[in-house]
Amino acid sequence: VLRLFPPLQVAEAESLRNDLVRAGPLPMFTLNKKLVKAAQAHAADIGQNKAAPGHSSTNGTNFETRMNRLGIKHCATENISISSQSILLSVILLYLDIYLPELGHRKALLNPNLRETGVGSALYGKDQYFLVQDFACTQ
């Protein structure tokens, strides 16, 4: 996939290759309707309000509270991204975690304990997309 985006041939791409080999085969995510609802609602909230990207809603509700309200009580995380080109590019950038030394997005995507997911996106400004990926262990 990185061949489709030559500017992404960066040091993080090599570390991603290594992490993918180290992780080995991972189970497929199961779509969780609650996580889809949460991810889409958060994306729409941030996008429609043109708010600064973040894990808290525009009303101040944090990620943990949003998950608890849906009955997801443990083992959950969220990735967010903004892209002006495509949703696919947003996901690739989350795996690469360019300029993010803690590699938090990548760790979430490669965590074998996170088995359920929901994804949402919304237009962010004129030509960008705000992508939200919510993950949880099997509840």
Where are these regions (language model features)?
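A short alpha-helix/helix-coil micro-patch that ends at or immediately precedes a cysteine
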Residues: 1-49
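A well-ordered secondary-structure block
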Residues: 34-138
